[in-house]
Amino acid sequence: MALVSADSRIAELLTELHQLIKQTQEERSRSEHNLVNIQKTHERMQTENKISPYYRTKLRGLYTTAKTDAEAECNILRKALDKIAEIKSLLEERRIAAKIAGLYNDSEPPRKTMRRGVLMTLLQQSAMTLPLWIGKPGDKPPPLCGAIPASGDYVAKPGDKVAARVKAVEGDEQWILAEVVSYSHATNKYEVDDIDEEGKERHTLSRRRIIPLPQWKANPETDPEALFQKEQLVLALYPQTTCFYRALIHTPPQRPQDDYSVLFEDTSYADGYSPPLNVAQRYVVACKEPKKK
């Protein structure tokens, strides 16, 4: 029943999103005339080689209108982004509900483990579709935007992806990509599933063994302080794996769509680090351990 109500709400939101996209285009078309007027006024001023009181007054009015138009378009786009975020949240809730229903449905045969190539593609898609944080003028990026860690009292929700420190088969410890199943306030412990085992490998871990992954990409052009900087020590997901390893930032992203370039610690190389490899913002988190000498 919950899945049906989620589906109907998603359909409503998609309709609302479509209307907002149409409004954006209408607003843009409406403001186009004013922008053309600004350009023509500047051309006339250059031709006459002077700024008369008439042109000064006219431009002030045109720019005031342009600013109002831009703010109106911006407000519509923000509403559209909110709709997209709500749709993604509902889709995630639906996925978790379906997963739980599958776990407790004894009448169905067990699902086959996802092929590794499919899993890697899904991880790449998750990184690409991570929303870019777009604040209003003067806003500071929130926790879990880029390199900004979660607040001290933050509790990751079921379905959230995290870096989790677990014991490997050999007894060593490693950081894996995991999905939160639940959190107990009584014990202050998480239950998480190894993402590579699709729920077959479940771990109960204390808070200090969990690092929530970023929920927004940081924009290097507007919020560079929300990114890890060159030579900063991090944990990064090694390409084509589901494990995090220590690495140094080689180059931070320069544009919103760029990845980090990182140097993984690797004793097989003379200087102790691998050649530069690209890792998406989604899969780079702070490393609290000291840097190796």
UniProtKB/Swiss-Prot annotation:
GO terms for cellular component: ATAC complex; mitotic spindle; nucleus; SAGA complex; SAGA-type complex. It is found in: Nucleus. The keyword Secreted does not apply. The keyword Acetylation applies. The record marks 238, 245 as: Histone H3K4me3 binding. One of its GO terms (biological process) is response to endoplasmic reticulum stress. Residues 152-293 form the SGF29 C-terminal domain. Residues 3-86 form a coiled coil. Interacts with dimethylated and trimethylated 'Lys-4' of histone H3 (H3K4me2 and H3K4me3), with a preference for the trimethylated form (H3K4me3). Component of some SAGA-type complexes. Component of the ADA2A-containing complex (ATAC), composed of KAT14, KAT2A, TADA2L, TADA3L, ZZ3, MBIP, WDR5, YEATS2, CCDC101 and DR1. Interacts with (methylated) CGAS. Interacts with TADA3L, GCN5L2, SUPT3H and MYC. PANTHER family: SAGA-ASSOCIATED FACTOR 29. This is SAGA-associated factor 29. The lineage of its organism: Eukaryota, Metazoa, Chordata, Craniata, Vertebrata.
